[in-house]
Amino acid sequence: MTDVQIVDQLRSTLPADDDHPYRTGAWRPQSTEWHVDRVEVVEGAIPHDLDGLYARNTENPLHQPITRYHPFDGDGMVHAIRFRDGVATYRNRFVRTDGLLAEQESGTSLWAGLAENPRHAIRTDGRTARGSMKDASSTDLVVHGGEVLTSF
């Protein structure tokens, strides 16, 4: 039996009828963090000797950009599927960067995005060479010393 739990729901100010090509369809942002205890197997079976984790990092914007949007501007969300004893579990979590927390508090985008003019930034204390960009920590992940690390 599949047990689905909502872990957290982050505030999003994106419009419900958003039609930006990088925020619709398969690119549609998710603002909910989930835990699925037993993922339903649609066909076949998960081998009992399969033991491991598949993880990926994706971009999930929560707020309208200041002017222009590039997919790398979305906040990082790690998705993970854990396989053990013929069962798969799923979790997704936002990477809670300083930038994500500040924008959640303010309810708006604060830093200029990759395709924006840096002068449009509301805050200029970003982590990149431009200074006015948020490190969304959304494009890569590595495992080092038993920890999953994300990066811009």
Regions found by a protein language model. Name each.
Residues 1-152:
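Beta-propeller domains
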